Structure formats: C-alpha cells, structure tokens
Amino acid sequence: MYNAKSLKAEEFISDEEIKETLAYADANKDNVALIDEIIEKAKLRKGLNHREASVLLACEIPEKIQEVYDLAEQIKKDFYGNRIVLFAPLYLSNYCVNGCVYCPYHLKNKHIARKKLTQEDIVKEVTALQDMGHKRLAIEAGEDPVNNPIEYILECIKTIYSIKHKNGAIRRVNVNIAATTVENYRKLKEAGIGTYILFQETYHKDSYEKLHPTGPKHDYAYHTEAMDRAMEGGIDDVGLGVLFGLDLYRYEFAGLLMHAEHLEAVHGVGPHTISVPRIKHADDIDPSAFDNGISDDTFAKICALIRVSVPYTGMIISTRESQEVRNKVLPLGVSQISGASKTSVGGYAEPEKEDEVTSEQFDVSDQRTLDEVVNWLIKLGYIPSFCTACYREGRTGDRFMALCKNMQILNCCHPNALMTLKEYLEDYASEETKRLGMELIDRELEKIPNPKVKQTAYEHIHDIAEGKRDFRF
C-alpha cells in the first residue's frame, strides 16, 4: 500500500502506485485540458507530484513539450539564476564486494586494475585538482568493509580539507559511498561533509535484485531507505539519482519523484540534488546489453520535468554526457556539472596510459579541460561558479530549502558566484578565459539589485585582484 510518510521502502516506493501512475499517464497523454492544467500548476513554482509529472512525460504533443522546456528554463533562472556550479569526482578506491552487473568494479571482474589511494596519493590528487581550480569534490569509493571501511573514508575527508596548495583549497566534500548505518552517517556529518549522494540505480525491486545479485547492495530495502538513515544521522543535504537505462525510464522517473516526495513528507526537506546519469561503456560493461536505454531527446525531457516537478533541487549532469548533450540540457534546468573529470583511481596526478589496464568506472564523454569548460559556459552566458558558501554559512537542509523555495538564494549566490569566478580567473584561467570572464563579471555585477550588496561585491572583486581570497555573503 502506497504511503509517502512510511519508512518502509516498498510503501513509499510502491510498485502498485507506480503502475497505476503509468496507466493514468497513458490514459491522459493526449488530454490537452489536463495537460494545460498541470502546466499551469507548474508555473506556480511549487512543483508537481509524480502522477502529474508522469502525464507530461507521456505526452508527445510537440508544442506542450516546448512549453515544459521553456518553463524549466525560466524556473531554473528564478531559483538559481544563470549560475552553473562546477565540481569534480575523486575516486578513492575501486575495491568492491558487490556484484552489480552494470559496473566494472564488480567483484568478479578480474582484469580491472584494483587501486586504493593512500593519504600521500590523495595529497597528489587534490593538489592536481586545486591546480585546475576546483573547490568542490565528490568522493567515490566501492563498497568493501576491509579495504574501504568508514575510518578510511573519514581519514580521506580530513586529508582533503587539510590541503592548501598555493591559493587552492577544497571547500566542500560531497560523499558518494554505499548505504550505511545511522552511526556511520553521523560520523560523516561530524567530518564536515556537504551532500551525501546515493544513486538508487533502479526503483524496480525485481530488476534491482537481478542487477545486484550478490553483496550487501543486493538488499533493496536497506539501500532504498538509506536517505532516511542519513537524515536521522544528522546529514542535512542528500542527493538522489537513478541510472537511466537499467529499467523502463517512465517507471524510474515516477519512483524518483516519489522518493523526493517521501523525503519532503517525512523530513520536511526534499533532495538537495538530483543526478541523471545514463549507463555508459566501461571496461567489461557494454551499455547495449541493457535494452532500456533512452534517446537524447527523452533524456532532455526528463531533465526538464525534474526541474518543473522539483523546482528547488540542484540538478547534476556529469561528464558521462558529451558536450553536445550538455549543450542540449543546460537550458532545461541543470545547475551543476562536473568538469575535467577522471573516473580512474589516481587519474588526476597520473593519468592512465592508453595501453594500461584501466581502473575507470566508466568512459568519460566530455574530455575538455576545466578551463575549456569554464570558457564554454561563459560564452553561453552562464556564470561558472565555484561557490561553497551556503554549506560553510550553515545554509543547509531546511534552512537552504526555505531560502530556495522563496527564491532568496539569488541574493547571496549571484555575488558569491562572481567572486569565486574572479578567484578562478586570477589563479588558473587562460588569457582568453580571463578576458571573457572579466567582461562577464562586469556585466553581472550591475545586475545585483541591492546597492549595499553590489558595493560590497565590487570591493571584494577588487580585493581578489589584489591577492585576497575566500569572501562570501
């Protein structure tokens, strides 16, 4: 029985409810009156429920889809402005005891190069990332209680935060590790993490169990209920995501929104971020072996509908996607992207050679440098942001959501983005990127409505040019 407030996975992600939702969507996909009503509700910027959004996903009327696209772009601007936050993944270890059939880290893969970073390795990796200009990392590790215990993860976080190379610093560490206990989530909170990220992979229970035949991840309920334990452990910000291509996308989409609704209903705070990865080629993994792949157009539609359905959430697109695809979906509500990513263990300090046995989790589609990504964003009219101020100012969880839902984040995020971009331009940018970036900053400073904030931002931009760092509102 479906119950959004239940703490049992099979009740807040009800298979029966999803099937009824999909049937309802099919029955109403050409119901223009209902579709218009749903779009009008979306314009209120309060979101849509899983049934309403599923009707729009099933709809194939071109002009209605375009209305959704236009609305998604406007909602993103209303909540987040024209900023795009940049981050990089840092793979700590690819040792894993699970048998996930879509991931090359699976236990039975004997020809992947198994690696685990030492603390000395982490210093090299983080120094390389700081030399690019990164300020925000998402650490990743396989599930292995012997090689990757929570104590190892905590030590890595401490090391990462301690590294100050030249003007570099990692100011926010997000964590993407396997589902764990309330006690361990409490330890992660105490370590000062940003967002705890855990992809559901698939919400279809039978498919989930077949795709995860062995290892602790086989337990669907334990995995699906992880975010509740994380929030019980004091973690304010959590990030959801499914791996599109493992099961039918409309089922996954409904499940994803139901999970967001559950977090809001139980904890009063929905997901801080939603990621939309698609299965990609990797070592012994062929994505064509999974027959639920989605087209670029469907992918774009999903991105737009996540934005109108969960307007306050940060939406993340990684370098799994090509530059072409990222061009397509950036206007549809994306607020965070990775740049210059390496999905191999130790890949930043010592990139793997072509003839070397790989340790990558998946092939990276967007191979550009961080400077090239920043340059590209500026030319598209976006502000590349390295900001981590909300996390460090305590604007997390319900405090962040209250500001975001009232569209007040812009009052601090816009100047913060400009100041962190100025830091990047001074310390890391090529001459062309620096020139374009300074022109952008000059234009965007004029858009700050509050005269006092504008004046302070001008002063901080000047101070950054003089060598000072780390200002924030």
Where on the chain are the PLM-derived regions?
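Generic structural signal for well-ordered alpha-helices
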Residues: 88, 126, 154-161, 185, ...
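An N-cap/entry alpha-helix motif that binds or orients negatively charged groups
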Residues: 36, 40, 47-84
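Conserved C-terminal portion of the radical SAM core fold
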Residues: 141, 195, 200, 221-285, ...
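Short glycine-enriched, charge-decorated loop/helix-capping segments at active-site entrances
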Residues: 211-217, 288-292, 359
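Core AdoMet radical
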Residues: 107-124, 128-231, 236-246, 268-275, ...
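Radical SAM enzyme core and accessory elements
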Residues: 1-37, 327-332, 341-473
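Canonical Radical SAM [4Fe-4S] cluster-binding loop centered on the CxxxCxxC motif
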Residues: 80-81, 85-121
